[in-house]
C-alpha cells in the first residue's frame, strides 16, 4: 500500500509501497496528487528499464525528446531511447557511459528555453553514493 511521508511541510515527500512500473489508475492518481501537494517526490528502490521509465513519465503528460543540438555523433549513437538520457560520471575506457556523460551533472532546469516548458522532470538514480 502506498504511503506518502512529508520530508518538509508542503515541499518534498518520500513515497513507499509502490512499483511505478505497475501502477493501476487509482495508485497513479494518488501519486499524481502527492506530486501536486509536495512538488518533489522521492521513490526509492525503483528498478526501471528505459522503456518503463518512459511509460511512467508519459503518465504525467507529453514527453520531450532529448535535444540533440550540437551533440557529437558518437554520443548520439549511445542514445537508445529519445526520451531517456544517461547522465553519469562513470567512465569506461576513459569515455563517459551516457549520451551526455556528466556534462549536465550540475543543477539546471530542463527545457526552460521552450515556449511551454514541461511541468516536471524525472530523475532515476541508479548508483548514488
What is each model feature region?
Residues 2-40, 44-129:
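Fe(II)/2-oxoglutarate oxygenase catalytic core
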Amino acid at each position: 500500500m502506498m504511503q506518502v511521508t512529508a520530508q518538509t511541510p508542503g515541499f518534498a515527500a518520500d513515497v513507499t509501497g509502490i512499483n511505478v512500473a505497475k501502477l493501476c489508475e487509482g495508485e497513479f492518481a494518488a501519486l499524481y496528487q502527492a506530486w501536486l501537494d509536495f512538488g518533489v517526490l522521492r521513490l526509492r528502490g525503483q528498478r526501471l528499464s528505459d522503456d518503463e521509465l518512459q511509460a511512467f513519465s508519459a503518465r504525467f503528460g507529453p514527453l520531450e525528446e532529448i535535444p540533440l543540438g550540437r551533440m557529437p555523433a558518437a554520443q548520439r549513437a549511445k542514445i537508445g531511447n529519445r526520451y531517456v538520457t544517461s547522465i553519469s560520471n562513470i567512465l569506461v575506457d576513459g569515455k563517459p557511459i551516457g549520451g551526455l556523460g556528466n556534462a549536465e551533472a550540475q543543477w539546471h532546469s530542463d527545457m526552460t528555453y521552450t515556449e511551454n516548458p514541461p511541468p516536471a522532470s524525472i530523475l532515476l538514480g541508479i548508483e548514488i553514493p
